[in-house]
Design a protein with these regions (language model features):
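Short, surface-exposed ligand- or partner-binding patches at beta-edge/loop junctions that are enriched
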Residues: 63-64
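Rhodanese-like catalytic fold shared by cysteine-dependent sulfurtransferases
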Residues: 1-21, 27-59, 68-106
Length: 106
């Protein structure tokens, strides 16, 4: 099973109406600058104490600025028993460059 997803794959899944949890693990100030619609903000540093906010049976797509923190979050969630988690390769920056140029880059 792959634990990554590209921005184009994510866009296709969202366009199909797939039920996904978009987990933003950036800081609140970053989320205020740019975010994906309908995402849930849980900064990486608060993720361990925020697990109850997430459904272990849901498909979760973690994202951050470039994909590093969300990679850490993906690994952590898998260790905690979340079985359907993917890291968005390239993060919101790749989303802005390849999918939606209206999403601000920072």
């Amino acid at each position: 099973m792959s634990f990554t997803i590209t921005v184009k794959e994510l866009k296709a899944r969202l366009d199909k109406g797939d039920k996904l949890v978009l987990l933003d693990v950036r800081e609140p100030w970053e989320n205020a600058l740019a975010k994906l619609d309908n995402s849930v903000l849980i900064p990486l540093g608060t993720l361990p104490q925020s697990l109850a906010q997430l459904d272990k049976s849901a498909e979760i797509i973690a994202y951050c600025h470039h994909g590093m923190r969300s990679g850490d979050a993906t690994g952590f969630l898998l260790q905690q028993g979340f079985s359907n988690v993917k890291n968005l390769i390239g993060g919101i920056d790749a989303w802005s460059l390849q999918v939606d140029g209206k999403v601000p880059r920072y």
